[in-house]
Amino acid sequence: MASLGKYVSKLAGSRVLVIGGSSGIGFGVAEAAIQNGASSVFISSSSQTKISSAIERLKENNQSAKAQLHGFPCNLGSPDTLTSEVENLFAEVAKSGKLDHVVFTAGDKLAVGKLEDFTLDAIRQAGTVRFFAPLVVAQQLRKHLDESGSSSFTVATGGATEHVSKDWSIMYSYLSGLRGMIRGLAVDLAPIRVNAVAQGPTDTEIWSYVKEMGYWDNVTGHLKGRMTTGEIGKVEDVVEAYLYLMKNKNTSGSVVETTGGTLLS
């Protein structure tokens, strides 16, 4: 069999952890890593049931692949247990050796609403998964990633920071802060590369309720009107941004946009 060549084999033999990998874009990243030759793929989410289901789907969809698949639960939703949960996750993954890439796509409910209605505790909670968890994960990377420019940490964020909407003050604060975090971590963790993917509307399981209630066409019609592509993003397209950041050893401290042209409209 002919060699795949240097342009499509950059992830061959790599070990990839996807935090938030049981569904949506995270699942897509895990599958893409498998199809790009990763030797071991680890996925994590808060639900063991979802992890088991995801691993079965990955095996079914990629029967000819040789990658080893592993899954470990990790609940990022509580500030009180966040550090211990992340430490336990990396302790489990470390039993198989060091990683080459960590991808963070975990998320939770967006704290959108009238600012005065949020307590300080609620404001803090709003950033636990999307802001504080990536920082806590970053604390583990020197120990558990190969310290070289081939290694990377990629974090999902939203493309919404460029458009100011009413009642989004809390989320804008965290989403904007995450972009600064990426630049700081790129310096602090060097030579490990740190980047982010800013995602626009993407058709994932998070929209299931909207589809079930019959609102999908109305909601997406409004969104499409703000997108120069005129199409809601597909997981297989958005995932290409993550592959680019894992493969490109010349990129660190960057935010790659995959928003369907939303930022231009």
UniProtKB/Swiss-Prot annotation:
Pfam families: SDR (PF23441). It is an enzyme of class 1 (oxidoreductase). InterPro entries: NAD(P)-bd_dom_sf, SDR_fam, SDR_superfamily_enzyme. Disruption phenotype: Does nor affect the production of the fusarubins. Induction: Expression is induced in presence of sodium nitrate, and repressed by glutamine. Belongs to the short-chain dehydrogenases/reductases (SDR) family. It comes from Gibberella fujikuroi (strain CBS 195.34 / IMI 58289 / NRRL A-6831). The keyword NADP applies. Keywords: Glycoprotein, NADP, Oxidoreductase, Signal. This is Short-chain dehydrogenase/reductase fsr5.
